[in-house]
From Swiss-Prot:
The lineage of its organism: Bacteria, Pseudomonadati, Thermodesulfobacteriota, Desulfovibrionia, Desulfovibrionales. Belongs to the Thz kinase family. It catalyses: 5-(2-hydroxyethyl)-4-methylthiazole + ATP = 4-methyl-5-(2-phosphooxyethyl)-thiazole + ADP + H(+). This is Hydroxyethylthiazole kinase. Keywords: ATP-binding, Kinase, Magnesium, Metal-binding, Nucleotide-binding, Thiamine biosynthesis, Transferase. Gene3D superfamilies: 3.40.1190.20. InterPro entries: Hyethyz_kinase, Ribokinase-like. Its cofactor is Mg(2+). One of its GO terms (molecular function) is ATP binding. Signal peptide: none annotated. It comes from Desulfovibrio desulfuricans (strain ATCC 27774 / DSM 6949 / MB). Pathway: Cofactor biosynthesis; thiamine diphosphate biosynthesis; 4-methyl-5-(2-phosphoethyl)-thiazole from 5-(2-hydroxyethyl)-4-methylthiazole: step 1/1. Its EC number is 2.7.1.50.
Length: 285
């Protein structure tokens, strides 16, 4: 996994500016995760300034978690500006399929902005791919969760969406999938506690912004690096909390402690550790 180590170390060296137009539930988590990954976050969301902010940034992350008419316009303006400047744009279609506003907003975004990557849970990706998937709030339906038995079908759905949009498609879950027209990969890093804190998916998109910001011409590799890095950090955080030999010893605690330890683990993660722990395999289709 040398390429992942190289990308993560490049993020640390170059500190890419990542512009996030995200939801107010996890905006602080995303900003801190960008910092932990080695980037520099800016969370501006007013349409009057987003073009200027995009010009200063290396990547743009759009998250529709808490939509309103003001931020929808900001997303469109920022996305078009990023496209005109050749800067990668990440879409996190939170709650796709849950409401008419989300669906119409996604239709506009996908029609007017070219995305380097689209990251969502299995229900969200299934909805965008035209499958019969419905949202359960911002979480995936149980019938859509990615398991070993459903891995190939989920990968095929992700690849279909990639081919129709030109974006690398990431399906988040217990097993993560990264797909594009050239193939699909399974990432088996992470820990169940990641699903017990709000914002872990949003943080993943933010880390993708960091990696794409330094490797815009290696989009699949950048997305794989981001997904595996956050997963490895999640594993280390759990090991640290329960006393399995983490750097800080066994601290105990619950989900609040885990959230902080996840940031700690990402901030301490280096390319060597990522390369040795990343569990990425190609999905045969």
């Amino acid at each position: 996994m040398t390429v992942f180590a190289d990308i993560l170390d490049t993020v640390r060296r170059h500190e890419p500016v990542v512009h996030c137009i995200t939801n107010y539930v996890t905006v602080n988590d995303c900003a801190n995760m960008v910092l932990a990954a080695g980037g520099s976050p800016i969370m501006a969301d007013d349409a009057a300034e987003v073009e200027d902010i995009v010009a200063l940034s290396q990547a743009l992350v759009i998250n529709i978690g808490t939509l309103n008419s003001r931020t929808v316009e900001s997303m469109l303006v920022a996305g078009r500006r990023a496209n005109s400047m050749g800067k990668p744009v990440v879409l996190d279609p939170v709650g796709a399929g849950a409401s008419a506003l989300r669906n119409s907003t996604l239709q506009r975004l996908l029609g007017e902005v070219r995305f380097a990557a689209i990251k969502g849970n299995a229900s969200e990706i299934g909805f965008l791919a035209g499958k019969d998937a419905k949202a359960r709030g911002v979480d995936a339906q149980d019938s859509c969760l990615v398991t070993e038995d459903r891995l190939e079908s989920a990968a095929a759905t992700a690849r279909h969406l990639s081919e129709s949009t030109g974006a690398v498609v990431v399906v988040s879950g217990a097993i993560d999938i990264v797909a594009y027209s050239g193939g699909a990969w399974a990432v088996r890093n992470g820990h169940p506690l990641m699903a017990r804190i709000t914002g872990s998916g949003c943080m993943s998109a933010a880390v993708m912004g960091c990696c794409l910001g330094v490797a815009p011409y290696e989009m699949p590799q950048a997305c794989l690096c981001a997904v595996s890095a956050l997963g490895v950090a999640g594993e280390i955080a759990a090991e640290t909390m329960v006393g399995g030999g983490g750097e800080m010893g066994g601290l105990g605690g619950g989900t609040g402690s885990y959230r902080a330890l996840l940031l700690d683990a990402m901030s301490l993660l280096d390319g060597l550790a990522l390369g040795s722990r990343a569990d990425v395999t190609r999905i045969q289709m």
